[in-house]
Amino acid sequence: MKRILILTVVLLSGVYLASAQSTRYTAFEPASVWNDTDGNIINAHGGGVIFVKNKYYWFGEKRGRGASEGVNVYSSPDLLNWKFERLALATDTVNAQSDIARGCIMERPKVIYNDKTGQYVMWFHLELKGQGYKAARAGVAVSENVTGPFRFINSFRPNGHMSRDMTLFKDDNGDAYHIYSSRENYDLRISKLSDDYLFPTSKDTLLFSNHREAPAIFKHKKNYYLITSGCTGWDPNKASLHIADNLFGPWKNLGDPMIGPNSELTFGGQSTYVLPVQGKKGAFIFMADKWNPRNLIDSRYIWLPVSVNDGKVEIRWRERWDLKAMKDSK
Ligand code: DGJ
């Protein structure tokens, strides 16, 4: 009996070792399998990244085949090799009445740091359990530590508006904003957040009504750039880029910034975030999700360099690239 047990343990650990492959990455390979430093697939979809004391932290949706299982956080010093930190925000498995009761949908989490309160504040798109995508709310959670665990605070429709795909943006002066798809995704809106970043203020404006979602924003010099997708469920579509020198508009449509094979479908992906690279002037990475609705956990990541040259933005497909290839923007 004892021998059988030992044999089973040895065999099982062999299977485990064989299935978990840890690779030391030296380059980005968009849309390829990307494992964490333990050799498990990175499970952080619709995500965003912040930089804290020499490390990047990647927050994203933890997905099962279809299930929404909370928000994961990973850390990395080099943007290529990611260590799984923890489930940063869990669904509530105890209180079935909670807005984030197990069975809810949490999408597109973004985290920013509030210098005044010393808290990391997470906003995400929340759909209530059993209601499909009807609730259209924003959820807010906080933590004193970047890796969490985050405490759920509240969920609401900002100023009464439906809120689905979303992102957060913290400006250089510390003011922060929530950019969100509203009115059944026909409108894209922006609201300035309260000083503690926990609520929207009444400064809440329509950006444009082009039926767009998946907002990803960045600032270069005096301009704000906003990448969005069309609304075709999990299927990819054409991206567009808007520019403004004021977050509340007017926003000018600059067309599709993607270049290369399948660029008219965002290379098979959908925008989620634009990440400023530390220590490189005006260097940004475009982050997108290549969704696999039949097995959401296996949705892949498309990370590509953004080039900004005198206000002209280009995102060119690359099979394989590294940060050395990134040029400072003009
Ligand atoms: C597109 C959105 O961008 C995703 O985040 C997700 O909500 C899917 N629609 C669901 O169909």
Write out the residue ranges for each language-model feature:
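Carbohydrate-active catalytic/glycan-binding domains of CAZyme proteins
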Residues: 20-330
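Bacterial Sec-dependent N-terminal signal peptides
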Residues: 1-22
